[in-house]
A protein has these predicted regions:
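Small-residue (G/A/S/T)-rich helix-start motifs and N-terminal tracts that mark the onset
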Residues: 1-130, 134-141, 149, 154-292
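Active-site loop and adjoining helix of the penicillin-binding protein/serine DD-peptidase-beta-lactamase fold
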Residues: 146
Length: 292
């Protein structure tokens, strides 16, 4: 089955639900500090798209990460701090990376390219989005990429595989599988149904209102995913299948993103920031086993 609009998972695929999402969320313990709860390094945003940095950081903070280090451009950094003063903008230890949101490969300067490359070569789990997708081959640690159809088409083209956005849309689960196999990464392919493939795991996520098709929605998803990956970072390196762990976490992020969209919408229009602000309730519903 290849209809991306169907409400059911294709044969052989897992359908994401609140219980699976709950298991991917790292709960704080009595002996935790901000470091043990996960530190997310963030290199997102640009002079052209500074808001993407704000949205991703906001979403990560509201999903429950212990600490965020934002290391993007100065203008975006000022906007991030104005919204979230608890964010740290000094370099230092991180346990996972979120890179690429709010960047455009065509306008990315050498400094940004070098900084993202250095992050990806640390061997840490990384969420690679948008304007950093062309750099995924430089990563030395486990990676989850978060393309939409057009971005996946460009990513595959860079690997010598021709597939138009229309072809990918016509068989989204099949192309998500092929991309994961060819690129050696976990793939979260965004759409009305989101398809996640990593290692031996295939998950379909059908959650959220069509109002989620709004500017900045993907930046919020990146922040949610970055937060969950940072929380899971201690168990990823020693896992028998690190990409399968990333797939479980990525599917949970997609479910939370969709549920937060439903909560924020209430049947009406929403903005990306509305979705980020609804994230604590979406997390709570997952932990309680409720929600869609």
């Amino acid at each position: 089955m290849s209809d991306a609009q169907d409400d059911h998972a294709p044969d052989g695929w897992i359908r994401q639900d609140a219980e699976r999402t709950r298991r991917a969320i790292r709960l704080p313990r009595d002996d935790d500090d901000k470091y043990t709860r996960g530190v997310l390094g963030v290199r997102t945003g640009s002079d052209r798209y500074p808001g993407a940095a704000v949205l991703g950081v906001e979403a990560a903070a509201r999903t429950g990460v212990g600490m965020i280090r934002y290391l993007g451009p100065a203008g975006a950094s000022a906007s991030v701090l104005a919204r979230r003063p608890e964010v740290v903008t000094a370099d230092g230890r991180v346990q996972a990376w979120l890179v690429g949101s709010g960047m455009d490969q065509a306008h990315r300067d050498d400094a940004a390219t070098d900084a993202i490359t250095a992050a990806l070569r640390q061997g840490l789990p990384a969420v690679v989005d948008a304007g950093a997708l062309d750099l995924v081959g430089r990563a030395t640690g486990p990676v989850v990429v978060t393309p939409h159809f057009r971005e996946l088409s460009r990513l595959l083209d860079g690997a010598g595989i021709e597939a138009s956005a229309e072809q990918i849309a016509a068989d989204a689960p099949g192309w998500a599988e092929r991309a994961a196999q060819e690129l050696g990464v976990c793939v979260l392919l965004k759409g009305a149904t989101t398809y996640v493939v990593g290692g031996g795991t295939r998950i379909a996520v059908r959650a959220g209102t069509p109002w989620l098709a709004t500017a900045g929605s993907g930046d919020v998803l990146g922040g949610v995913l970055g937060s969950l990956v940072a929380g899971a970072s201690a168990r990823i390196p020693d896992a028998a299948d690190p990409l399968a762990v990333l797939a479980d976490v990525a599917a949970a992020a997609a479910w939370l993103h969709g549920r937060a969209g439903d909560i924020a919408s209430g049947g009406g229009p929403i903005t990306a920031l509305d979705v980020a602000e609804a994230m604590p309730r979406a997390v709570r519903e997952a932990l309680e086993g409720s929600g869609a």
